[in-house]
Amino acid sequence: MDYGYIHLIIGPMFSGKSTELIRIVKRYQIAQYKCCVVKYLKDIRYGNSVYTHDNNHVSAISTTLLYDVVDKIMNFDIIGIDEGQFFKDIVSFSENMANMGKIIIIAALDSTFQRKEFNDILKLIPLSEKVTKLNAVCMECYKDAAFSKRITKEKEIELIGGKEKYKSVCRKCYFLE
């Protein structure tokens, strides 16, 4: 049996995770691999596509549980997953698919706006052949930013949004009001 692998791309908001996911998927497409991308169903900002903040995009399959779309993706070699932190079954799905020979590329936030682990996404680190941690630019002081800071009053963990709700910040600016 051929084994696949897991590539986990993590970082804060605006660090280029989706851009990197799309770049890798498009590279595999050029190499004649059959590729698909899965996105989180509740992220309705861009319809049935994954968009980057600079308007690059690919079409995607939308779902809230990855196992719900297994039948749609089994014929693909490469499975890209955007916003991986939102999928409750991300760990078992990724491990099972990689063990079946699929290449799984996941873009995900590594922490919440409270700097706590985001659901089970960090459990993929010991299961991944490759982990890429990206930084953004601090939207306050322009240094490297490793954190996402919510700029609205909502308290729930799952709050989908962009610059209207979040900014990327460095350690120092995270604690500034």
From Swiss-Prot:
GO terms for biological process: DNA biosynthetic process; thymidine metabolic process. PROSITE patterns: TK_CELLULAR_TYPE (PS00603). Its EC number is 2.7.1.21. Substrate binds at residues 113, 157-161. GO terms for molecular function: ATP binding; metal ion binding; thymidine kinase activity. Belongs to the thymidine kinase family. This is Thymidine kinase. It comes from Sheeppox virus (strain KS-1) (SPPV).
